[in-house]
Design a protein with these regions (language model features):
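Glycan-binding loop/region signatures in secreted carbohydrate-active enzymes
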Residues: 6, 109-171, 240-267, 330-354
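Short secondary-structure boundary/capping elements
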Residues: 79, 168-172, 304
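Acidic/aromatic-lined carbohydrate-recognition and catalytic surfaces
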Residues: 1-156, 162, 195-224
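Active-site-proximal helices and loops of the catalytic beta/alpha 8
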Residues: 2-5, 25-32, 38, 45-47, ...
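A near-ubiquitous, low-amplitude feature marking generic local secondary-structure context
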Residues: 16, 70, 74, 86, ...
Length: 460
């Protein structure tokens, strides 16, 4: 019952003419994001990288947040510490948490070369950052006296690979995490390239009790980026969560590639959405679902992308909206039932309880969320229809959990602009639920006397 937004795309400050001003630019959008139903924003790496024109995935000084003149300037590509703090505090005032992008696998931009005495190789491993914190030498990286051969993980793009078993490195990672949460007021972490190092490092950071908001036992939201198949991610989640009571999530790459198939392959078999290959189907509580991100490049989804967003916003998992899709691709569509805003509204109001697949064939997928209620939440559930047919509306009769129930469409989109009709189940809960060609429709239960125009998403 929460939605995050990835609040950047690759080189977004350059593309938007906001170099060194991205934190300020995001702050201008906080109120709008709050009104749209965004609960958290994932920020790019906040510390100084090997260059002030870098996106930050080549970290140099973890404790320079844009305040020291090094690597080509003072500010990072996104701004400075004061502007970052102002953004986080404004977001917090609007009940939006901020997630920090943690790049702790590798470093870049070393100041000197060194000869590693363990293998005689010369590498750029001498770091003397102007923050005065976390100076590094060859022993901070692999091969190190603390780990000559990497027990877990792999190198990334030839960058010096941090040895987390070195006590100095290990301590610096905790100092960095404490700064982000206890000083800057971040609420969670996204860990980059987790296949590069042992999951135990993330487990320990996730299970640490941070001081935040007057409490001494705050545990952040934690999600890892493991760009791999379902079995690999499942194994990683099993290991990462073995010794922590703060459950760690993973981005659902297998689902994302299935959704690309839905959108970009006209003959994609929708039954593939029902198998156990995706994280959300096997471990919904550990799934961070998404459609595209900053790394996809030429592999981005190009057709009917709202079909993918509709899927992640009605199913379990923690859905992430991509800034470029929301703003640059114009998929927010505020004030209509045909965009991301309407899907977010439906997610918050109706998408509670377990998902139950009612029908799946190559071209039609129908699911019900059974609803959820407690002292703080009332989500009555929904019926979701996804239609892969490109030339006509399609639906079928399914047996729902609701007998003699009126259903109204609240969010929909597709290759036909027609307004979906209301539905009424019979005494056994049966009714036919259609969706537009190459589109989707979300139906929700509504009392007979209620005005449907008051519940259609996006029309408030």
């Amino acid at each position: 019952m929460a939605v995050m937004m990835q609040a950047f795309y690759w080189d977004s400050p350059k593309a938007e003419g906001k170099e060194g001003e991205w934190w300020n630019f995001l702050a201008e959008h906080v109120e709008e994001l709050k009104n749209a139903g965004i609960n958290a924003i994932w920020l790019p790496p906040v510390n100084k990288a090997a260059s002030t024109t870098s996106m930050g995935y080549d970290p140099y000084d973890y404790f320079d947040l844009g305040d020291f003149d090094q690597k080509g300037g003072v500010k990072t590509l996104f701004g400075n510490r004061a502007e970052l703090v102002a953004l986080i505090q404004k977001a917090k005032a609007h009940s939006i948490g901020c997630y920090a992008d943690m790049v702790i696998n590798h470093n870049s931009g070393a100041d000197e070369e060194e000869i590693n005495p363990l293998d005689g190789e010369t590498r750029w491993t001498k770091f003397t950052p102007k923050s005065g914190k976390f100076a590094r030498d060859w022993n901070s990286f692999h091969p190190s006296r603390f780990e000559r051969e990497m027990v877990e993980g792999e190198n990334f793009a030839g960058f010096p690979h941090l040895c987390h078993r070195n006590p100095t490195v290990y301590s610096a990672m905790f100092d960095y995490a404490r700064m982000l949460i206890e000083e800057l007021d971040f609420a969670g972490f996204r860990f980059d390239f987790v296949k590069g190092y042992g999951s135990w490092m993330i487990t320990l950071l996730s299970n640490y009790r941070f001081e935040k908001d007057g409490a001494t036992d705050f545990m952040p939201y934690v999600v890892g980026e493991l760009w791999s198949g379902g079995d690999d991610i499942d194994t990683w989640l099993e290991k990462a969560n073995r010794y922590t009571d703060n459950q760690i999530a993973a981005f659902d790459f297998p689902l994302r590639y299935k959704l690309k198939g839905v959108c970009d392959q006209p003959n994609f078999d929708l039954r593939q959405l029902t198998d156990g290959g995706s994280i959300v189907m096997k471990r919904p509580a550990n799934a961070a679902t998404f459609v595209d991100n900053h790394d996809m490049g030429a592999d981005t989804i190009v057709n009917d992308k709202l079909m993918a967003y509709s899927f992640i916003l009605v199913h379990e998992g923690y859905p992430s909206i991509f800034w470029f899709d929301y703003y640059n691709n114009g998929l927010a569509r505020p004030g209509t039932p045909n965009g991301i805003n309407a899907l977010i509204e439906a997610h918050h109001k109706y998408a509670g309880g377990d998902s139950q697949i009612l029908h799946a064939d190559p071209n039609l997928y129908i699911m019900q969320r059974i609803g959820w209620a407690d002292k703080n939440t009332q989500q009555p559930g929904l019926i979701y229809v996804l239609n892969n047919m490109g030339d006509r509306w399609s639906g079928t009769s399914v047996k729902t959990q609701w007998p003699n129930q009126r259903f109204v469409p609240v969010a929909w989109d597709g290759h036909d602009a027609a307004y979906p009709d209301e539905r009424m189940t019979d005494a056994e809960g049966n009714a036919e639920f259609p969706a537009p060609p190459r589109g989707y429709c979300i139906y929700v239960p509504l009392a007979p006397e209620a005005n449907k125009d008051e519940v259609i998403a996006g029309l408030k």
